Amino acid sequence: MPEKLAKAIANPLFPALDNALRSGRHVSSEDLDNHALLIEFERELGMFYRRYNTELIRAPEGFFYLRPRSTSLIGRSVLSEIDMLVGKVLCFLYLSPERLAHEGIFTNQELFDELLVLADEKKLMKFVTHRASGSDLDREKLYDKVKTSLRRLRRIGMLIPIGENGKFRISESVFRFGADVRTGDDVREAQLRLIRDGEAVVHQQEPSQSSLLDGFDADDTGHHDSELTMQEGEV
């Protein structure tokens, strides 16, 4: 084993970091110690994970994550369509002036309100009802699904919880949901278009994605497969 790789694996931070990466977590600069470890040993750990037919990716924004190949020895799972949509709204908010005005802090309710404004509400209601328009109870069900999505996205490193009152900061890792609009003239406008059009564009994902809001059955599970794949774990 190369000396520098042995040094990386011997680091007391590595076992928990390795487990987090295999569970689908994205490690951004907010996670100072783990991010510094990945920066220092990026080449060696990249070689380490290639043994599992998995790539250690460093995104242009600086965050790290694992991307399994089709023959990977590390499991993979998928995010639901509503998870993907919530992720895209988080990316939109990350790009917004409101993030600076709020010192980067948002609440679950603010995210939900923004989702209702940006996306087609009739299509959103298909996540919880077969009716063309939703009742107040349906809105409550949709809000519960959004909160569940936020918990999933928190576990994979897309946001950082602040206290116990449903407040959070958005991590730079949310660019996983908006990578293909980075080079546009107005990335925020392009991200808004993706949300309204129901497009799911994901960083370096080879297969084309199906619509976020069209072509799915409305049931109570909310687990509709999407092609943004994450490693095995509670995604």
Swiss-Prot record:
The keyword Ribonucleoprotein does not apply. Pfam families: MukE (PF04288). Keywords: Cell cycle, Cell division, Chromosome partition, Cytoplasm, DNA condensation. InterPro entries: MukE_C, MukE_N, Scp_MukE. Gene3D superfamilies: 1.10.10.2250, MukE-like family, C-terminal domain (1.10.10.2260). Its main location: cytoplasm. GO terms for biological process: cell division; chromosome condensation; chromosome segregation; DNA replication. GO terms for cellular component: cytoplasm; nucleoid. It is found in: Cytoplasm, Nucleoid. The keyword Cell cycle applies. Residues 204-235 are annotated as: Disordered. Interacts, and probably forms a ternary complex, with MukF and MukB. The complex formation is stimulated by calcium or magnesium. Involved in chromosome condensation, segregation and cell cycle progression. May participate in facilitating chromosome segregation by condensation DNA from both sides of a centrally located replisome during cell division. Probably acts via its interaction with MukB and MukF. Belongs to the MukE family. This is Chromosome partition protein MukE.
